[in-house]
């Protein structure tokens, strides 16, 4: 019985591994970056909404990390949509490059403004709410136009 279970588990794991995105492909690279951005953003939002304790130094570091991450995924969107693999990006990403790039720049500006807000002392979570909301709004704007749900 154990052998059957082990064989079944091995087969399932092998099949699951076959369907993944190549982590070195442009799609794999941007998915990794977007997941990191989401995790950092959720932590920042959690601190401001009371879901997580507000830790000033962690917030400052995470805001800087988010700003850094925000500048990296765009290079992994090739000019022409790559073949193969499932992507949540709509075809509009490649058909409306100027608009996509404009939203990317808005996102970068919003994270830069959040970092700037972390330099004001004493650091108060209430003073960070509006800059963080702009970051979240810029994410949402791009998702609404260019992400297939």
Predicted regions located by residue number:
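C-terminal motif of bacterial Sec signal peptides marking the signal peptidase cleavage site
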Residues: 14-17
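Sequence context surrounding c-type heme c attachment/ligation sites in exported
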Residues: 19-56, 64-149
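Bacterial N-terminal signal peptides that target proteins for export
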Residues: 1-7
């Amino acid at each position: 019985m154990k052998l059957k279970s082990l064989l079944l588990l091995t087969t399932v794991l092998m099949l699951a591994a076959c369907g993944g995105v190549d982590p070195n492909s442009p799609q794999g690279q941007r998915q990794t970056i977007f997941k990191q951005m989401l995790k950092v953003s959720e932590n920042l939002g959690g601190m401001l909404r009371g879901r997580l304790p507000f830790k000033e130094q962690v917030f400052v570091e995470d805001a800087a990390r988010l700003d850094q991450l925000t500048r990296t995924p765009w290079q992994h969107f090739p000019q022409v949509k790559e073949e193969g693999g499932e992507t949540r990006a709509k075809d509009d990403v490649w058909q409306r490059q100027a608009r996509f790039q404009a939203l990317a720049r808005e996102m970068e500006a919003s994270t830069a403004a959040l970092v700037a807000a972390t330099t004001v002392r004493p650091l108060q979570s209430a003073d960070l709410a509006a800059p963080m909301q702009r970051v979240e709004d810029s994410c949402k704007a791009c998702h609404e136009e260019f992400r297939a749900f």
